[in-house]
């Protein structure tokens, strides 16, 4: 119903937002001048903005919709007759999830995680806005490419482009191999 549509929209939203908008929202949430960021910083000693953790958070938020959409599709493809049969045998919902649903959705989840990882390593906009581009601290491969191109070092930019292409291609090939083995 409406609640599910709301959560689905919220979990998918980072996929359609401009990355700089997502980065700005993260800045507002995690700033030490805001309640959540202040709590993390003062109560737990965790600083997120302009740190390597900020890079991870930004890339994860941007990539999450890919994982979520794949996992959701995998769970939706499960034959409900199998679930109904398990219920008629008296199997608890907890066991149905762990022993039937999760194993049946495993390939979709793995594909989603792999696609999300491939997307996360190429993230630029939200990471730049939220974590910055601090050399040796928060610089990502995508930021490094932009930096060396701006300085005219096309050879280094080419090297880093090849690295990202190789990692992304390896992710896609692994998804195809994993999904191909299941057929």
Predicted regions and their residues:
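Glycine/proline-centered hinge or cleavage motifs at structural transition points of membrane proteins
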Residues: 89-90, 103
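Membrane-helix/interface signature in polytopic inner-membrane proteins
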Residues: 72-83, 93
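Glycine-rich helix-loop "coupling/hinge" segments at transmembrane-helix boundaries
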Residues: 27-28, 32, 126-152
